[in-house]
């Protein structure tokens, strides 16, 4: 956990920089998924993987793997498009936490979590000097509980209550 900064100083990273870190992460994930798709496609179409009898399923299994990899590539491409289109907005106390908010939560035990509310690509984590930041979507239970809230409010998800310490 990153040490706390002096009073009045933000314990959250700059959102533009954070946004770029997530885009870079998605680009790297896309590259890896495309390589995996290419490998799976080559295995599925390789002449040695043609079934010789009804029990020889290597080619069929490779085809299923290639299909799954193609879906993964499409999911990452969709998330990347959503991230690139995301307009970063400053926190507005009148509206509360909205899409593109960067939120610092603290549990009763003092554990801090940094969350970035994004349209797609939930569950990704990127390391920062301030601490790890995880992407969540408004469709998730945590995302739903944060929408409209402000620093000082409490949220409860999966039986654990946390205070919203800061929102940008």
Regions found by a protein language model. Give the residues of each.
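Alpha-helix boundary/interfacial micro-motifs
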Residues: 46, 137, 156-157, 161-162
């Amino acid at each position: 956990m990153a040490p706390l900064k002096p009073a009045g100083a933000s314990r959250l990273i700059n959102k533009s920089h954070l946004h770029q870190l997530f885009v870079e992460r998605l680009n790297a994930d896309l590259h890896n998924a495309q390589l995996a798709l290419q490998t799976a496609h080559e295995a599925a179409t390789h002449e040695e993987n043609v079934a010789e009898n009804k029990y020889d399923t290597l080619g069929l299994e490779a085809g299923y793997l290639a299909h799954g990899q193609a879906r993964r590539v499409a999911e990452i491409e969709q998330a990347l498009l959503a991230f690139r289109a995301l307009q970063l907005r400053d926190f507005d106390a009148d509206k509360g936490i909205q899409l593109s908010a960067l939120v610092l939560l603290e549990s009763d035990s003092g554990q801090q979590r940094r969350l970035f509310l994004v349209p797609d690509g939930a569950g990704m984590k990127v390391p920062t000097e301030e601490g790890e930041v995880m992407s969540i979507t408004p469709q998730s239970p945590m995302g739903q509980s944060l929408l409209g809230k402000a620093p000082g409010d409490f949220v409860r998800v999966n039986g654990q209550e946390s205070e919203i310490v800061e929102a940008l």
